[in-house]
Each structure stands twice: as C-alpha cells, then as structure tokens.
Amino acid sequence: MIIVTGGAGMIGSNIVKALNDKGYTDILVVDNLKDGTKFVNLVDLDITDYMDKEDFIAGIVAGDDFGDIDAVFHEGACSSTTEWDGKYVMDNNYQYSKELLHFCLERQIPFLYASSAATYGMTDKFVEDRHYEGPLNVYGYSKFLFDQYVRRILPHAKSQICGFRYFNVYGPREGHKGGMASVAFHLNTQINNGEQPKLFEGSENFRRDFIYVGDVADVNLWFWENGVSGIFNCGTGNAESFQAVADAVVAYHQKGSVTYIPFPDKLKGRYQAFTQADTTQLRAAGYSRPFKTVAQGVREYMEWLNRKP
C-alpha cells in the first residue's frame, strides 16, 4: 500500500493520479474533508481507502498496524501563508510531520514530503543551504524547522527521506484553494465570467518560478523509484513573469486584454518579486527530465479547466 497525506489536495491528488497512471491503486488517502468541495479531486482516481488526518495520526502515534507500506508521500499541511495561529501551524505542519517521519524510519518505509520555497524568504538566491534560508511567516518557519530536523537525521537514516521545496505550483485540481489558487486559475475564471483579466501593475517585473503540477508529481515518483534521499528544490530553474502567465491564458481563449490594478499597500514589503529555483542539486541527483514552460503548462491547464463534460 502507498499512503498519500493531503491526497485530496492539489499536489497530493496529482500524485495519486500519477500513481494510478503507473498502475498503482492500493492507495490510502489521508486528508481533512471539512471543506467537502475537495472530494471532486478524488472522483476520477482509484484508491483503496480514505482516513481523516486526525484519526490517521492517532493511529500512527499508537503504533497501529497499517499493513505493508511501500511509501508515504506526505503532502498534507496547512499551506496558507497568511495563517498566523502559530500553535496550529506548528502542530499541523511540524509535530505531525515528525510523528509520521519516525513511524516510517522505524519500519524503513520511504518518506517523501512537501517542503516549500517559503523556507527562503526575501533572497535572490534559492539554494538548498542554511545560509540562504530566512522564512517570512510561520508557515515558512514550520517547513524550515522540519527541514532542519530532517538534516540532522539524514546521515544516520536507514531508509529514504526526501523533501521537495515546491515553488509556484499551478495546474489541475486546485479549484478548492479559493484565493490561494494560481494566477492562471483566477484569470481563466475572470475571462469565463465575461470580465477582463486583471493583474497588479508592474506584473511584467514580478517573476516567479512557475512549475506545472504534473511535473511536480513526476519528480516525486522519480525520486521514490530511484531511492534518492535529500532536500531538493522543486522548480523549473527558470523564472517567468506574471505577464507571461496572463499572455498564455489570453492566447488560449483568444479573447480578453489584461487590465492592470494598483498594487495593494498591505502586500508592499511582504511580496516576493522574484523566485527561481537553483536546480543544481536536483539535476545532480539524476533527475534529467525537462520541465514545461509557462506557455506549455498553462495551455495544458487551460485545456483541462475548460474541457467539456
């Protein structure tokens, strides 16, 4: 059996799909379906069972027998960068991850988990090194601290531990994320609602490392299949502008022109104007597949979003 926590979320459900595509269906999805809309991410997927995240971790702590486990993909977390309840975030992201990690280590189960580019904060160099890490919010700190915890364990671990620092992920199965969904998702919605697509003023100068979620799932499966341990950036290594995203959405729809709105005061000084993964360590580990450009990935995403039932 394979366990995917956060399996009803965006990245988790895409990992389940990638596993299905390779013939794996004995999958336990762990999530919190308090937001019931997330169920739609699982409708077309084949899984064996579902567990609530609280029931699951209680079983982990109690040492329950989950049978033979081939791997754990730990994607579940509070991913809101605007959540400031530190106790909740640290319990949910840090303590939960530690309990699950030790369960896997004791049983020599491969453990692959979601870290984040939020571990870096305001920097122009995104290298997997303590020198460049300085999270700006408690979410980023929870991910940073778990990475630090893993770094101390890695030299002595007898089974795989692999963390991925996700950059700006976009693509299918993110509709439940609301305001946290990607710019491509929101621009598509605006055009379909008959509105002009909107960007912040200066968006041609805001450049992020946008990575298609299908590529993220592929990275996860490749590292699992090859048994590689470590903490790796998961981005394309090529920053592109928000304007490029908008251009790709408009090109797909063949209508609409971008309207520019003032940059909000509340984001000034708290907004990463630039992110770009250093992929040196990812490539050195042996992952050599190309990543989709914004033009390629957004088109594929638009085709999925606007598919006819």
UniProtKB/Swiss-Prot annotation:
One GO molecular-function entry: NADP binding
Enzyme class of the recorded protein, top EC level: isomerase
Annotated active site: Y139 (proton acceptor), K177 (proton acceptor)
Annotated residues for binding of substrate: N168, G179, H186, F200, E201, G202, S203, R208, Y271
Cofactor (UniProt): NADP(+)
Pfam families assigned to the protein according to its UniProt record, in alphabetical order: Epimerase
E.C. numbers: 5.1.3.20
Entry's free-text remark on domains: Contains a large N-terminal NADP-binding domain, and a smaller C-terminal substrate-binding domain.
The protein, known as: ADP-L-glycero-D-manno-heptose-6-epimerase
Organism of origin: Edwardsiella ictaluri (strain 93-146)
Annotated gene: hldD
